[in-house]
Amino acid sequence: PDSDGDTVIDKDDACPNTPGLVALAGCPDADGDGVADKDDDCPNEAGPAENNGCPWPDRDGDGVPDKDDLCPDLVGTVANNGCPEVTESVRKALLDYAKTILFDTGKSTIKPQSEEVLANIADILDDYPNVQFRIEGHTDSTGSAEINQRLSQERAQSVMNYLIEKGIPSERMSAVGYGKDRPIADNNTREGRRTNRRVEIHGETPNN
């Protein structure tokens, strides 16, 4: 006999009084997730069998389940394991902010008026917990290569130390000095030299 008329005979039917699917031994599957309703903790929401028929939680709603999401409380992308990616606009903002950081002449001491800029930079870095940030120091061509190299390294390190104090983990940052080797303007003019004395901050996601 087949009491529920689902083409699964009663002796083989795990749900003999409820029409169901042959593939599920005659039991129904309301949400179509392949888990029989009787075994499904979420019978009206599709979910994997390994989670008892319930969908994996996704706190930030970015489409990456919390179990696979490296940033479960920040909206991110599937390609970046659920973490936000550094967009071009954010990259530009970091560079624009970093270039306005001021130091005492010939020293690595950050001027007090740069603290607001650094606080803004720290806020940006905090939004990208799986991104590695490289802090670069650059100088103009005035003075010896050795002095410029050391000064650029010390300035990059000063910025990194400040950001560490603001709560950015040290392992997410590196500081490197390039001295006068990477000018972006003409060192033969006062304006060009001022432009070349700068800090840059670059962020790279692990899969880049």
Mark where each language-model region is.
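Periplasmic OmpA-like peptidoglycan-binding domain that tethers envelope proteins to the cell wall
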Residues: K107-E116, E136-N208
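Periplasmic peptidoglycan-binding/tethering modules of Gram-negative envelope proteins
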Residues: P1-Q132, T205-N208
